[in-house]
């Protein structure tokens, strides 16, 4: 059974990206190897609950939203996030993932909008940026 460690799942209005204003279910995964100086989600570094894809899917379904954003922490730090994104797309959600740009995005399902949070020098983690990701961004992706 495929599982992820979930910090929280919540329903809110998207406040960032081109989807700003849309009701969205956010799935916040636990864990991040980076320690950005301005991180606003340090609480997601640890703890959380292991949940199966189906358990997560049923919680998302209760919100009756078309949009799902997978965030963190750093979602790509969990190996099962790639099949989970595909699972969400197969359920006909409009899916985005917010990632630190510290991991390769080439294996992410093409139906997913990738939101790259490029690390500036002030983050103290700018050396982690994967420049190779810029070359494979799609028109539906954002920086």
Question: Model-derived features: where do they sit?
Answer:
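N-terminal [4Fe-4S]-dependent radical SAM core
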Residues: 1-49, 62-64
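Short, flexible micro-motifs
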Residues: 18, 24, 75-76, 120
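A secondary-structure boundary/capping signal
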Residues: 28, 71-72
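Short, surface-exposed acidic-centric catalytic microdomains
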Residues: 38-56, 107-116
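Ser/Thr-centric signal marking residues that sit
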Residues: 41, 69-71, 99
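Glycine/small-residue-rich loop that forms an oxyanion/phosphate-binding "nest" at active or ligand-binding sites
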Residues: 46-71, 77-79
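Conserved AdoMet/S-adenosylmethionine-binding subsite of the radical SAM
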Residues: 76-143
């Amino acid at each position: 059974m495929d599982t992820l460690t979930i910090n929280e799942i919540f329903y809110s209005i998207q406040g960032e990206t081109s989807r700003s204003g849309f009701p969205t279910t956010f799935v916040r995964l636990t864990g991040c190897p980076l320690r950005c100086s301005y991180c606003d989600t340090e609480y997601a570094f640890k703890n959380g609950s292991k949940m199966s894809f189906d358990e997560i899917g049923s919680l998302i379904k209760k919100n009756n939203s078309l949009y799902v954003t997978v965030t963190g922490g750093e979602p790509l730090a969990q190996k099962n996030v790639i099949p989970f994104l595909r699972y969400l797309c197969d359920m006909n959600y409009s899916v985005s993932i917010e990632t630190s740009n510290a991991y390769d995005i080439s294996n992410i399902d093409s139906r997913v909008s990738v939101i790259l949070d490029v690390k500036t020098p002030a983050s103290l983690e700018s050396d982690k940026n994967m420049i190779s990701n810029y070359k494979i961004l799609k028109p539906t992706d954002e920086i």
